[in-house]
Amino acid sequence: LLPSGAAWIAAARTLICADLHLEKGSAYAQRGQLLPPYDTRETLRRLSLDAATHAPERIVLLGDTLHDAAAPGRIDPDDAQTLLAIARGRSLLWIVGNHDPDGPGALPGPMPGDTAETLTVDTLTLRHEPLAGEQSGEVAGHLHPCARVAGKGRTVRRRCFVTDGRRLILPAYGAYAGGLSIRGAAFAGMFARPPLVGAIGSRRVHAVSWGSVRGEL
């Protein structure tokens, strides 16, 4: 598990990241909420760095890679070229999400990669939205897990990985993607036992016990 929010399966040379939500900033700007319009560039910069560091043979984008159906019309040509460069020389798979059911098909120009609902990697099943109930071998996104972690007289809120050893939920990779508390209703009944939390720090992923995670204020 990487501090960028991606997961790396070394044996399969596969890099997985969920919920990039490219062009979320420009979507908010159209609604009058002015945010710095650089979220797509920052998200792709981190993906480029992960790809350069690990040299994956395959990158799996685990759904909601684009923030909305109109995102392809707003993406800067330079950012589209960065995405092309990331895909060059490797397999790129777009798992479709609820925000981007068409995958890369709506992006300008020829975009590399295939589109699928799920992908099987050895004993793992990769999909965007986790199925209800306990699932063995599932790797999913969609829920944007975050944890409010107690320690040293204060709490800090961090994006996080969350797993019970049977299934893994990835944090949102996108710069503006936000998150939901893993103590909230969206995660209820999802794990067979109290899960282990991997809170994302600036340089590494920190293992956090379930007992150290607080509910939202």
Enumerate the predicted regions with their spans:
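Extended recognition/assembly regions associated with phosphoester-bond processing machinery
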Residues: 1-217
